């Protein structure tokens, strides 16, 4: 897609470079001239946009207007641009953190809605960039199909979530049972309808560009929808698996900015000239310490550590359970060098605090590469930010570019090292079986438990 350029600078049908003559060809032959002309026409018809385009050929996107509130502009008018940006970023950061705490207080369902809203906004910002770059081509149905595919993919992923975590609710609603039973077929049929609409929308002079934008939409869906689905999966494991990773990325973003602002001297990467080694290293140590402390505080409360479950009897999400071993204090022997520093041989920790070190390390060492990736994308399209939704910060995608990598890592980490069989899910699957199947499973399980010595055999009189 980066090789396309604005329609106004594209060569006309007869401006394509002619193929070189073979040795021995008669330069003035009528037959050869006609053959060459036909070949050129055929090449031009099929390949109107040659692969010789460079990134500099991409039309520039007009800069977004400044959306900083007038009250802030007046209050900070006497400051230099550097300190003005500092105060704007700081005030908006504190505001967003306060709103985040409020949503946490409102419960897991509101957090899910927040994730869904952020996903839609990030998708909108990325798709809008493609539309603004190539809007002069007047591509048919591009925006309509993009949003249609977003709807289809969300229907597929969140339908899977409903089937997994809302089984008791679905069993009471006959209409929902049909949708869940044939969910994957319905999802596939919806996607096929969009696929056929795309094929029908193809226009001869825009074939290549339309396929570029088709790929653009699907990659955007992969980045936004898939990752947001994983975030919600992490949330169902317990709110702590949602809060510690996300807050670690936020902490790293803030502390790396602070260390870089005050102490930054050595550039870190060319993609982001303002990033420095001082900020990167300072952010790493700050994030590990923050994650360790946050894990200790949150591990004390059932509200944060219990898996999120939907209870049909109260028609709401509940976070009540007996905390697992991860969230129960354990005594550990310290290694020799720590014994000398702390002057004690043992320490009591929650096992989750040890896992938090791995999460914080990823957030501070690998997570920033999501931001570097986004910086490269923005440089390719000559834009400063994805949007101007948040003054001083850019778009929503500018704030969540690192979170998507983190979501995938946490999901892989949980499935690889933490998650075991879920009794609740097993029970839900048993409840939808036929009575004969349930009875057979009961007899098999009873026999197994008797052989293990857990149950006593029933005496026949």
UniProtKB/Swiss-Prot annotation:
Alphabetical GO biological process terms: CDP-diacylglycerol biosynthetic process; lipid droplet formation; phosphatidylinositol biosynthetic process; phototransduction; positive regulation of fat cell differentiation; signal transduction
Transmembrane regions: 96-116, 149-169, 183-203, 230-250, 279-299, 357-377
Predominant location category: endoplasmic reticulum
Regulation: Inhibited by its anionic phospholipid end products, with phosphatidylinositol-(4,5)- bisphosphate showing the strongest inhibition.
Disulfide bonds: none
A Pfam family assignment: CTP_transf_1
Cofactors: Mg(2+)
Compositional bias segments (type: Basic and acidic residues): 20-56
Region (Disordered): 1-67
InterPro entries given in the database record: PC_trans, PC_Trfase_euk
Record carries keyword Ribonucleoprotein: no
Subunit structure: Homodimer. Interacts with FOS; this interaction may enhance catalytic activity.
Protein's name in the database: Phosphatidate cytidylyltransferase 1
Protein species of origin: Homo sapiens (Human)
């Amino acid at each position: 897609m980066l090789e396309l350029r604005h329609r106004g600078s594209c060569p006309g049908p007869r401006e394509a470079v002619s193929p070189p003559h073979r040795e021995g060809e008669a330069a003035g032959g009528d037959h050869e001239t006609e053959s060459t002309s036909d070949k050129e026409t055929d090449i031009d018809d099929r390949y109107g946009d040659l692969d010789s385009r460079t990134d500099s050929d991409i039309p520039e996107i007009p800069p977004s207007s400044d959306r900083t509130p007038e009250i802030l502009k007046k209050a900070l008018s006497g400051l230099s641009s550097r300190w003005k940006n500092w105060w704007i970023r700081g005030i908006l950061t504190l505001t967003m953190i306060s709103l985040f705490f409020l949503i946490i207080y409102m419960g897991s369902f509101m957090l899910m809605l927040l994730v869904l809203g952020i996903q839609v906004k990030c998708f909108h910002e990325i798709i809008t960039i493609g539309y603004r770059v190539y809007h002069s081509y007047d591509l048919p149905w591009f925006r309509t199909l993009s949003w249609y595919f977003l709807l289809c993919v969300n229907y597929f992923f969140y339908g899977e979530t409903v089937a997994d975590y809302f089984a008791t609710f679905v069993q009471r609603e006959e209409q929902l049972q049909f949708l869940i039973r044939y969910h994957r077929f319905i999802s596939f049929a919806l996607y096929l309808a969009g696929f056929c609409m795309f094929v029908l929308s193809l226009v001869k002079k825009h074939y290549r560009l339309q396929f570029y934008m088709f790929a653009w939409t699907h990659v955007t869906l992969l980045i936004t929808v898939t990752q947001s689905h994983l975030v919600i999966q992490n949330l169902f494991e317990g709110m702590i698996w949602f809060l510690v990773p996300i807050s670690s990325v936020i902490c790293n973003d803030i502390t790396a900015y602070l260390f870089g602002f005050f102490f930054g001297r050595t550039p870190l990467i060319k993609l982001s000239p303002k990033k420095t080694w001082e900020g990167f290293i300072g952010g790493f140590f700050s994030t590990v310490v923050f994650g360790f402390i946050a894990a200790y505080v949150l591990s004390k409360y059932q509200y944060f550590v219990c898996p999120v479950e939907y209870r049909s009897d109260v028609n709401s999400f509940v976070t009540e359970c007996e905390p697992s071993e991860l969230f129960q204090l354990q005594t550990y022997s310290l290694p020799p060098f720590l014994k000398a520093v702390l002057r004690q041989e043992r320490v009591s920790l929650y096992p989750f605090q040890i896992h938090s070190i791995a999460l914080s390390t990823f957030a501070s060492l690998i997570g920033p590469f999501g931001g570097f990736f986004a910086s490269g994308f923005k440089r390719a399209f000559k834009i400063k930010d994805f949007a101007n939704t948040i003054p001083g910060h850019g778009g929503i995608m500018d704030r969540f570019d690192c979170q998507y990598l983190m979501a995938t890592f946490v999901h892989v980490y949980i499935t690889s090292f933490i998650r075991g069989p879920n009794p609740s899910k097993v029970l839900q699957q048993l409840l939808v079986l036929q009575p004969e199947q349930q009875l057979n499973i009961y007899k098999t399980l009873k026999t197994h438990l008797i052989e293990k010595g857990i149950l006593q055999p029933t005496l026949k009189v």
